[in-house]
C-alpha cells in the first residue's frame, strides 16, 4: 500500500497484483560445487567457503550500501578463499571458464541456466524481495473502457502466474537461444 501510494503521488500510476516473480540478488554455484559439496542454501557455504572463489561485478564490492560483499559475508559468516571482481559483461564467461566457483546473480537471469548454475536458497533472507508487478498509469482503464472493458480484469489474471523458474527460462530463450 505504501509503495502503491508513492507511485501514485510521484508518477500518476498504480500497481496491479504481483505476477509471482522475485528478481532479487541470488547466489549461484557451479555444478562442480554442487557435485562436491551439495549445498542447498547460502548458509551451507560457511564451512566450505575457504575452499571457494567468489566472483561478482565491481559494484558488489563497493563500500556504499547494505547489499554488498562486506555485509553479505559478515551476515552469513563466509570467508571465501578469494573475492574476484569482474566486469559485469564478463562474469558469466568467467564462471564458465572456472575463474571462480560462487557468483552473485539475479534470480531470473537466463544466463544462470546457460552457465549451469544452481541458485542457492537465501535461508536467512539477506537480499530483499524485488517483486514483479504490472504498473499502469492513472486513467488507463477509463480511457479504454469502450474498446477494452475487461482490460483491468484481464491484466489481473497475470497475478501469481509466473515463477522465477519460468521467467529464467523465458530470459534464457531471449539471451541465449
Give the label of every model feature segment.
Residues 32-35, 59-63, 108-111, 139-142, ...:
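Solvent-exposed loop/turn segments at secondary-structure junctions
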Residues 20-92, 164-165:
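Bilobed "Venus flytrap"/periplasmic-binding protein-like clamshell domains
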Residues 1-2, 29-31, 88, 102-111, ...:
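Beta->alpha turn/N-cap motifs
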Residues 1, 49-52, 94-105:
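Alpha-to-beta junction loops
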Residues 2-16, 99, 111-125:
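Ligand-binding "clamshell"
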Residues 6-14, 147, 157-177:
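Periplasmic-binding protein-like
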Residues 24-35, 131-147:
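A bilobed periplasmic-binding-protein/Venus flytrap-type ligand-binding module shared by bacterial periplasmic
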Residues 17-26, 122-132:
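Short Pro/Gly-enriched coil loops immediately N-terminal to beta-strands
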Amino acid at each position: 500500500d505504501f509503495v502503491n501510494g508513492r507511485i501514485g503521488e510521484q508518477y500518476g500510476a498504480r500497481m496491479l497484483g504481483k505476477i509471482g516473480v522475485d528478481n532479487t540478488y541470488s547466489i549461484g554455484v557451479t555444478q562442480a560445487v554442487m557435485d562436491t559439496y551439495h549445498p542447498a542454501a547460502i548458509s551451507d557455504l560457511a564451512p566450505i567457503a575457504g575452499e571457494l572463489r567468489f566472483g561478482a561485478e565491481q559494484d558488489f564490492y563497493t563500500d556504499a550500501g547494505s547489499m554488498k560483499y562486506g555485509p553479505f559475508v559478515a551476515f552469513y559468516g563466509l570467508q571465501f578463499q578469494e573475492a574476484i571482481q569482474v566486469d559485469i559483461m564478463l562474469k558469466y564467461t568467467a564462471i564458465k571458464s572456472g575463474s571462480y566457483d560462487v557468483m552473485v546473480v539475479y534470480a531470473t537471469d537466463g544466463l544462470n541456466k546457460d552457465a549451469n548454475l544452481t541458485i542457492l536458497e537465501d535461508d536467512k533472507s539477506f537480499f530483499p524481495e524485488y517483486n514483479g508487478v504490472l504498473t499502469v498509469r492513472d486513467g488507463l482503464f477509463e480511457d479504454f473502457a469502450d474498446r477494452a472493458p475487461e482490460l483491468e480484469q484481464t491484466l489481473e489474471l497475470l497475478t501469481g502466474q509466473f515463477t522465477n523458474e519460468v521467467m529464467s527460462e523465458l530470459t534464457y530463450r531471449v539471451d541465449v537461444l
